[in-house]
């Protein structure tokens, strides 16, 4: 690994050398994505989390951030992701995402597939009912 090389954004180098440090937005995105995907596919957690770590480390390697910026980005991502778990809507969407992933990846049992199909039909009926209601309201 090489350090003190030019950054991936040489046009910003003069400013980056004089500016204060800040949490890495790239790291926040990468680590949040890794946490989310790990929850959907826990069987691949090691691989997914390593990739999420590398996403942040790349910011140090190219000279865009200090290591502390990347560490702060991961901390911010973990805090936000933790907070998302207080939302019933988020938890329901995660449950559906895990279910859909297991089916599409061929990991679901027959019971899980039947339950998913039944829920999908229920959601489709509710969506059709809401669309009809909206159409009726728009025509009045």
Task: Give short role names for the model-derived ranges.
Residues 2-139:
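Membrane-embedded catalytic cores of phosphoryl/pyrophosphoryl-handling enzymes
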């Amino acid at each position: 690994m090489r350090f003190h090389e030019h950054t991936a954004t040489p046009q910003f180098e003069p400013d980056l050398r004089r500016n204060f440090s800040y949490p890495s937005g790239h790291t926040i995105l990468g680590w949040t994505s890794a946490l989310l995907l790990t929850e959907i596919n826990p069987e691949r957690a090691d691989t997914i989390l390593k990739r999420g770590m590398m996403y942040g480390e790349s910011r140090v390697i190219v000279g865009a951030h200090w290591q502390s910026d990347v560490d702060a980005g991961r901390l911010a991502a973990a805090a936000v992701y933790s907070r998302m778990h207080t939302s019933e809507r988020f938890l329901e969407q995660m449950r559906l995402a895990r279910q859909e992933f297991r089916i599409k990846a061929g990991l679901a049992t027959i019971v899980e597939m039947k339950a998913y199909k039944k829920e999908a039909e229920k959601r489709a009926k509710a969506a059709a009912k809401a669309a009809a209601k909206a159409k009726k309201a728009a025509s009045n």
